[in-house]
Amino acid sequence: MRILYKQPGQDPRSLVIPNELKVMQQLVGGRIETLRISDNGILVMNEEGKLLGLEENFYFGAIGDTIVGPVLVVGEDGEDFASLPDDEAAEISQIMRGGFEI
């Protein structure tokens, strides 16, 4: 599935990964936590990122908080993760760069 991946201090980039929990856990460095950030976009992050003191990644104005550690954004198909649509990827990428807020 096509995702958007962002590590702290780096620009977001598009990746293609298998739709597997283990792969997502490897990318975020631990157990995952999800947060809906748009109609079809779901942010996947490390569940214990703040407790572990992971590096700040970007400020997310819609929740008034800073997201820490490496993150990925996936789309959804019903109850399953899926490829992130291109239009959503472009908008979310801009947010992660600090361009505007949802």
Each PLM stretch: what is its role?
Residues 1-102:
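Domain-length accessory/inserted modules outside core catalytic folds
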